[in-house]
UniProtKB/Swiss-Prot annotation:
<dbReference type="Pfam" id="PF01421">
    <property type="entry name" value="Reprolysin"/>
</dbReference>
<protein>
    <recommendedName>
        <fullName>Snake venom metalloproteinase TM-1</fullName>
        <ecNumber>3.4.24.-</ecNumber>
    </recommendedName>
</protein>
<keyword id="KW-0479">Metal-binding</keyword>
<comment type="similarity">
    <text>Belongs to the venom metalloproteinase (M12B) family. P-I subfamily.</text>
</comment>
<keyword id="KW-0873">Pyrrolidone carboxylic acid</keyword>
<keyword id="KW-0645">Protease</keyword>
<dbReference type="InterPro" id="IPR034027">
    <property type="entry name" value="Reprolysin_adamalysin"/>
</dbReference>
<keyword id="KW-0482">Metalloprotease</keyword>
<comment type="function">
    <text>Potent fibrinogenolytic protease which cleaves mainly the Aalpha (FGA) and Bbeta (FGB) chains of fibrinogen and slightly the gamma chain (FGG). Shows preference for substrates having a moderate-size and hydrophobic residue at the P1' position. Preferentially cleaves Ala-|-Leu and Tyr-|-Leu bonds. Is more susceptible to tripeptide inhibitors than TM-3 (AC O57413).</text>
</comment>
<dbReference type="InterPro" id="IPR024079">
    <property type="entry name" value="MetalloPept_cat_dom_sf"/>
</dbReference>
<dbReference type="GO" id="GO:0006508">
    <property type="term" value="P:proteolysis"/>
</dbReference>
<feature type="disulfide bond">
    <location>
        <begin position="159"/>
        <end position="181"/>
    </location>
</feature>
<dbReference type="GO" id="GO:0004222">
    <property type="term" value="F:metalloendopeptidase activity"/>
</dbReference>
<dbReference type="GO" id="GO:0046872">
    <property type="term" value="F:metal ion binding"/>
</dbReference>
<feature type="disulfide bond">
    <location>
        <begin position="118"/>
        <end position="197"/>
    </location>
</feature>
<keyword id="KW-1015">Disulfide bond</keyword>
<dbReference type="InterPro" id="IPR001590">
    <property type="entry name" value="Peptidase_M12B"/>
</dbReference>
Length: 202
């Protein structure tokens, strides 16, 4: 059993205007959903000694502040730029996620930059609100945050684990567990990169 050092990830979550439309303008429904999501994410990261907290929630009530399109890499890039220029200067956080109601191309349900944690532009992720079951969406967020934290997919080189969090395809009955390979990837990321922003308790 690996012993991981205590780290803290303060999340900023932005719900796009499509989410506002999807939930009929009910911002309290979106807020409740996001809080439930973060509580699942927190639970999944606790074995790695990572405490995740929601440091801010933005709901784009009147309009999107970036162009949200079905090309996930373009949308993620735009969101990263916006986060770097706008959101970071407004409130401290370590990583920002855009929750979108837009259907993404190629049956993608999430995207994030590998090893991006603490970088002003690259510490971001994109998650589609792809299931009415909030736990399923939380697993996607946990998976994308894993990429930010240096984790690769559970596939090649004896790391296949179809039910694990970092499996390349979401399974219908997803596990809440990270594979040993994911834990090793995270440990390597901490050793090689030692991202400073996650050292501070919220």
């Amino acid at each position: 059993q690996q012993r991981f050092p205590q780290r803290y990830v303060m999340l900023a979550i932005v719900a796009d205007h499509g989410m506002v439309t999807k939930y009929s303008g009910n911002s309290s429904a979106i807020t409740t959903r996001v809080h439930q999501m973060v509580s699942h994410v927190t639970e999944m990261y606790s074995p790695l000694n990572i405490a995740t907290t929601l440091s801010l929630l933005r709901i784009w009530s009147s309009k999107d502040l970036i162009t949200v399109q079905s090309d996930s890499s373009v949308t993620l890039g735009s969101f990263g730029d916006w986060r770097k220029v706008v959101l970071l200067s407004q409130q401290a956080h370590d990583c920002a996620f855009l929750n979108t109601a837009t259907a993404l191309d190629d049956s993608t349900i999430g995207l994030a930059y590998s090893n991006g944690m603490c970088d002003p532009k690259f510490s971001v992720g994109l998650v589609q609100d792809h299931s009415s079951n909030v736990f399923m969406v939380a697993v996607t967020m946990t998976h994308e945050l894993g990429h930010n934290l240096g984790m690769a997919h559970d596939e090649a080189g004896g790391c296949a684990c179809s039910s694990c969090i970092m499996s390349p395809a979401a399974s219908s009955g997803p596990s809440k567990l990270f594979s040993d390979c994911s834990k090793d990837d995270y440990q390597t990321f901490l050793t090689n990169t030692n991202p400073q922003c996650i050292l501070n308790a919220p």
